[in-house]
Amino acid sequence: MQSTEAHMKEKQRREKIEIIFSHRVKGESYFHGSSYQWKNIVYQNYNRIQQKELKIEQLISEMEKEGIRFTQHRSLIHYPVIDFVKYIAKVYKETLEKQ
C-alpha cells in the first residue's frame, strides 16, 4: 500500500514539473535557445530564491555562466524570470515575498 502512495506522490510531482516547464512566459523570446535551459536553472534555484539566499540579479549572472544568451538588454531579463518564479510558487501553492 505504501508503494502505491509513494508512486502517486511521484506521479503528482512529475505532473507539476511538466506543467511548470510547459508554461509559456511572456518574454521567453528574450533568451537564445531552448526555454527548457533557462527555466531549468530558475527551477533548480527556486528554493534559494524563496529563502532569499539568491537574488534575481545573481540568478541572471548564474544563467550567463551556464551559457544562456539573451536577445534583449539584461535589465529586461528580470521580467520573464520573475514571472516564472511566481508561476512555480503558484503551482506549488506557496507564497513569495518581494525581494
What are the residue ranges of the model-derived segments?
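Charge-dense, extended regions
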Residues: 59, 74-99
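Short, local alpha-helical segments
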Residues: 24-25, 42-45, 66-74
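Long, low-complexity, charged/polar intrinsically disordered regions in eukaryotic proteins
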Residues: 1-32
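Positively charged, polyanion-binding regions of nucleic-acid-associated proteins
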Residues: 37-53
